[in-house]
Amino acid sequence: MFSSATTEEGGFEASSNSIIDNDYKSYGLELESSYDVSEDLNFRGGFTYTKAEITSGANDGNQPRRQPKLMYNFIPTYKFSQSKNTLGLSFIGQTKAYAQDNNDLVMNGFVIVNAFVEVGITKGLSVNVSGNNLFDTLAITESEEGNITDNAVNYVRARPMPGRSISMALSYKF
């Protein structure tokens, strides 16, 4: 569990050419766990729940920018053929968050699904195939502008998670 109250002295934000001068309070819970169902099957996961609020200024009562209420991960893995090989998935996600402290523009929540398989070829030699963001999910984690103006050209700079990728690696351990 955590709790915090922060007084921000005012920082310059170059992208919006403005001074950020907000006070904040937050509390929440973070939990991680791992469970071996059997010698071959394992579940790992974690989540962070955060209740955060701006407590001063023009945005008093709003949720701070880029702060989802819930972030989570879940990673099942399975070893097969005498534990020489491993198959796994990971689910990484978060709920919606706001682009700016005014809470006008929402960045949608998302779940990114990854998978991997590692196969032992010989003693010390293995091949790993990984797929990241298998469903090519658009996951925005950060954005600069917070308003969309009617009857105007609007530009919003955003930082997405990488799209789908597949990779293969050959490893030798000696």
Model-derived features: where do they sit?
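Flexible, surface-exposed loop regions and adjacent strand-edge segments
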Residues: 2-17, 59-66, 93, 104-109, ...
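Feature marks flexible
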Residues: 3, 16-21, 160, 164
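Gram-negative outer-membrane beta-barrel transporters
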Residues: 13-101, 169-173
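Aromatic-acidic/polar surface patches that form glycan- and anion
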Residues: 22, 65, 106, 159-160
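Transmembrane beta-barrel architecture of outer membranes
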Residues: 26-28, 69-73, 110-114, 155, ...
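Short, basic/aromatic-rich helical patch in the C-terminal catalytic core of site-specific tyrosine
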Residues: 31, 115-118
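Active-site lining segments that contact anionic ligands and/or coordinate catalytic metals
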Residues: 84-86, 110-112, 124, 163
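C-terminal beta-signal and adjacent terminal beta-strands/loops
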Residues: 96-97, 119-174
